[in-house]
């Protein structure tokens, strides 16, 4: 908790519109993180959802209930044809039938961070650390960057899948990570709320 408070204090500001970004999908984890950051830690989060190709009615209902309870929320729908193409190639090349969406829940969120000048991004838990996986970040390291995302979560297939998709830059906008220069200027910090519990 001490480490979390130190991180939050660095980003908490009455002068900024948003202190951090949280990712929400209509499930319990993102809602829990966003609620705690706003109410327990007095942060002003911008909740972001990346729409998948298929949505469940329950997930949509839960997300609407969450937003209606008093949160600023941005719902992004990346080009759905591009999503289908990336999902198909991701399935054949990487074994992930939802690979396009997996890319977008990282790349689109980071694009929002750059566009809104919000350097702190929270995901709920780190499946790689919680359930076993790529341990390069290390169990004692809470904050990470794009290299960890493209390695651990996208299993080093990100560039290959985007190239094989043969899609236009416009179609790929929400699927491409911001440039290294943009991220360096922002001083991006990505973390998981679960790391601090």
Could you tell me what each predicted segment is?
Residues 1-19, 36-197:
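Nucleotide-activated chemistry modules centered on ATP-dependent adenylation/adenylyltransferase
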Residues 32-33:
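Hydrophobic positions on the alpha1 helix immediately C-terminal to the Walker A/P-loop
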């Amino acid at each position: 908790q001490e480490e979390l408070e130190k991180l939050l204090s660095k980003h908490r500001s009455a002068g900024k519109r948003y202190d951090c970004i949280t990712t929400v999908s209509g499930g319990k984890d993102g809602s829990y993180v966003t609620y705690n950051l706003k109410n327990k830690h007095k942060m002003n989060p911008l909740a972001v959802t990346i729409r998948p190709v298929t949505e469940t009615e329950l997930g949509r209902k839960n997300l609407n209930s969450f937003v209606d309870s008093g949160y600023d929320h941005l719902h992004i729908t990346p080009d759905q044809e591009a999503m289908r193409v990336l999902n198909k190639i991701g399935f054949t090349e990487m074994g992930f039938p939802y690979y396009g969406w997996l890319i977008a829940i990282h790349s689109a969120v980071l694009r929002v961070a750059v566009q809104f000048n919000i350097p702190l991004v929270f995901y709920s838990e780190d499946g790689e650390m919680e359930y076993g996986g790529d341990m390069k970040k290390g169990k004692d390291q809470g904050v990470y960057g794009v290299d960890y995302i493209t390695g651990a979560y996208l299993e080093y297939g990100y560039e290959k899948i985007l190239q094989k998709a043969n899609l236009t830059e416009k179609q790929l906008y929400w699927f491409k990570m911001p440039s290294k220069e943009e991220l360096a200027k922002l001083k991006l910090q990505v973390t998981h709320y679960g790391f601090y519990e």
